[in-house]
């Protein structure tokens, strides 16, 4: 099953300021392209262009990519990956993510793509690694590749839904039967 990729993974492919993350991101994207296991939300492509063309103080005011190069890279992403676009379900789910999960609008929108489209994981360093949001688990590929994380929490076990169910009033008051 495919996983959703956040903007930061795409940007690190072109960011020389962190060679280790650059290598991890490039390999992740290369493998995802080869085995068709990565899906991009349209939001990641829009954010990719904005992030890579923004002037960087620590690069002497230069962007990571010249605008024309960033546009070509964005076109390549569109051609080579499955891209998800927002619809009413994604927007409704994103609103729920903001109100019930406390996510920022952009993070909620990203999560909503995965939740609505049944994608099990989001690959991102911007969420809490290993945390489950609804049916989606977040994986920080940079922590995993750096061996800073040894084990991910298991996905929700649906074999016995009663096991983790909080007690109801009915369970606490046997005389109500």
How would you name each of these model-derived features?
Residues 44-45, 49, 53, 59-78, ...:
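Glycine/small-residue-rich phosphate/adenosyl-binding loop
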Residues 6-8, 47, 107, 126:
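Acidic active-site catalytic centers that drive phospho-/nucleotidyl reactions
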Residues 1-40, 55-69, 145-151, 156-176:
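Short, well-structured N-terminal submotif of metal-dependent ribonuclease cores
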Residues 39-43, 123-124:
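Short beta-strand segments at enzyme active-site cores
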Residues 108-150:
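Acidic, metal-binding active-site segment of PIN/NYN-like and related structure-specific nucleases
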Residues 80-123, 157-166, 170-172:
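Active-site neighborhoods of divalent-metal-dependent phosphate/nucleic-acid chemistry enzymes
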């Amino acid at each position: 099953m495919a996983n959703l990729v956040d903007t930061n993974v795409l940007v690190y492919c072109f960011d020389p300021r962190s060679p280790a993350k650059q290598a991890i991101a490039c390999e992740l994207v290369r493998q995802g392209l080869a085995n068709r296991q990565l899906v991009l939300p349209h939001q990641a492509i829009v954010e990719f262009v904005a992030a890579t063309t923004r002037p960087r103080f620590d690069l002497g005011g230069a962007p990571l990519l010249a605008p024309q190069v960033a546009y070509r890279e964005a076109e390549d992403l569109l051609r080579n990956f499955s891209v998800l676009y927002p619809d009413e379900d994604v927007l409704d789910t994103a609103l729920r993510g903001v109100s019930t999960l406390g996510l920022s609008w952009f993070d909620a929108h990203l999560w909503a793509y995965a939740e609505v489209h049944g994608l099990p994981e989001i690959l991102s360093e911007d969420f809490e690694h290993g945390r489950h949001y609804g049916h989606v688990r977040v994986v920080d590929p940079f922590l995993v590749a750096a061996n800073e994380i040894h084990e991910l929490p298991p996905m929700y076990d649906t074999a016995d839904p009663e096991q983790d169910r909080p007690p109801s009033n009915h369970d606490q008051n046997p005389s109500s039967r």
